[in-house]
Amino acid sequence: MTHPYKTREGGATVTVFVPYDCQNNCPFCINKKEYADCSGFSLDKILDSIRVMDSITPRCDFVFTGGEPLADLNALQRMLDTIPATHKIYINTTFPAQAATTFEEMLAFTERNKDKITCMNISRHLQHYVEESPDEVLGKIACPTRINCVLYRNYPADRLVDYVERFLPYRIPIQFRYDYTETTPENLYEEDNDRILQDLKRLFTYKGLDGCRMRNGFHFEYKGLHMTYHKTLPYSTIVEKGDDGVTYDILYDILIKQNG
């Protein structure tokens, strides 16, 4: 970085890459290659880094991703227990069918931690890339939930309404996501040539837009269910002039990698 840096207001989001792999191979995942060799991964060092980040930004958000955070509930519990209540905690998961962990065990985990977890972001895509848990299981998750759906390349737009109808019985909000590896400052707020946005506007009720220079959300509603179309830039820092006239590198995200 060539300028003095500072975190965004409220502190940068701290994303923790869990030190264990998932069994998925989603085509848009850029993290999978990092799990090809798990030597050097360290839960203890990650716990140390979590404590450091808490001391620096005691109100920042923590996001757990991977990998599959729910693949090792004991390790995930240790990480959650290290984070004080001043932070919001988000977990990105496929809530998958797993050989070593039952749905009942995963649901019990959400019950034990429902006061810790701000939201569990559950991947459910139009195309099936993993063995998913039944939708009825998602309706039993004790903590707040949101469905995440990456609309990847030639997605089947004619299935969008049926997809949303699928989750109406559980009243779980849905976030459609643009492939962030293809997001640029030039297309972040592009509307006319954004096929996904135009499909969503055609099928659902558009409610408005919010965002910043780093990410945004186009909001929709369908039969009382809230949906968002989310776009974000694939990097963590932007250059911005502060109110004091100084140009800063604004840090939006801090990564804690698998080795801590």
PLM features: what roles do these ranges have?
Residues M53-I56, P84, M106-D115, D135-A142, ...:
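Acidic (Asp/Glu)-rich catalytic clusters
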Residues N74-D81, A99-R112, E131-E136, A157-V164:
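Distinct, well-ordered alpha-helical segments
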Residues H125-V246, Q258-N259:
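Radical SAM enzyme [4Fe-4S]-AdoMet core and its adjacent flexible, acidic
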